[in-house]
Amino acid sequence: MEFLQPPGWARPRGYSNGVAASGRTVCVSGMIGWDGQGVFHTDDFAGQVRQALHNVVAVLAEAGARPEHIVRMTWYVVDKNAYVAAYREIGLAYRELIGLHFPAMTAVQVVALVEDRAQVEIEVTAIVPL
């Protein structure tokens, strides 16, 4: 896996400008803040992020992938201000579950998610080396 950083560009904080990798591609559907049985245990933004990341890691494991194989993450949030306000807690959960691994990443505010209680949805692509 190669993290792409054009010469002279400021290094982004918490993500990479791009990633190049080859191997077995694993696509993880958008994971939200409910557990494996479809039950929400919190309406707290950071709490839902923690659960969504836990769900991502669980799905990756089914393919023999680990967090360090993630090459791209897309975060859909319903409230940008809640996302920004929870940066610290999100960072703690991210480092605990994903580690110090910062793939290409996009965060987008959306009007709503299909599940009404969901505040965040995280979609992931990973590439497991062959």
Language-model features: locations:
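N-terminal presequence-like segments and the immediate start of the first folded domain
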Residues: 1-71, 77-130
